[in-house]
Amino acid sequence: MVIHAIVPVKELHRAKQRLARVLDAHERRALSLAMLNDVLVALSYSPVSRIIVIGRDVETGHTARAHGAAFVIDQSAALNDALHQAAADIPDHAAALVAPSDLPLLGAEDVIALTCISGDKPGVAIAPAHDGGTNLLLVSPVVGWTFLFGPDSLTHHIAAARQRHLPVHLLRLPHLERDIDDIDDLIWLAQQPGDTSAQRLARMFLERKGAQLWQSSDMPPH
């Protein structure tokens, strides 16, 4: 199976707005780029043949090219439209792997596991998010596929696959079931084992702003 990875990246000035109570615009921008870096590192060691990063910022393009990824300027600023734009550059027979840029614990082994459960035959493999969303999506072939990210996207993607008579494979990956959107997610990231770029940044934020972060969090202090 020939796999092309698509990594959509939100405009950096709009990213991680729910963290604005504790992180300023510069810190949120740095966190977004650190997470993108971690995702691209993982994909570069995975079996994907090509990585396409789609976004709007110069820094996003620099980060993409530093990892040998293609950078496509997002013409829409809407996630599903951006994915269709990027997928239009993928050969019809190939598979597409959508990996959001805010999965800093993604590992190459996760991509391998997803491809293994899917096999070489047409089908859809999904790593679900904890809130009913889709955190990794592998579609083979990508031709004719409609991306349906948003609320309850797991249900929508399963329905779309069945409508096309494609088998669906679900892979539960607990470390990928939450993306980094709010203060609890940031604290959770800092506490997980590992040493990714985003984790180092999250731990630095926790060290500098510990009391403020815990006060704004629903998690019990450690």
Curated annotation (Swiss-Prot):
Its EC number is 2.7.7.105. The keyword Nucleus does not apply. One of its GO terms (biological process) is F420-0 metabolic process. It catalyses: phosphoenolpyruvate + GTP + H(+) = enolpyruvoyl-2-diphospho-5'-guanosine + diphosphate. It is an enzyme of class 2 (transferase). Pfam families: CofC. One of its GO terms (molecular function) is GTP binding. Keywords: GTP-binding, Nucleotide-binding, Nucleotidyltransferase, Transferase. Phosphoenolpyruvate binds at residues 134, 150, 153. Pathway: Cofactor biosynthesis; coenzyme F420 biosynthesis. Guanylyltransferase that catalyzes the activation of phosphoenolpyruvate (PEP) as enolpyruvoyl-2-diphospho-5'-guanosine, via the condensation of PEP with GTP. It is involved in the biosynthesis of coenzyme F420, a hydride carrier cofactor. HAMAP family: CofC. Belongs to the CofC family. The exact nature of the substrate is currently not known. This entry has been annotated based on its similarity to Actinobacteria. This is Phosphoenolpyruvate guanylyltransferase. The lineage of its organism: Bacteria, Bacillati, Chloroflexota, Chloroflexia, Chloroflexales. The gene is fbiD.
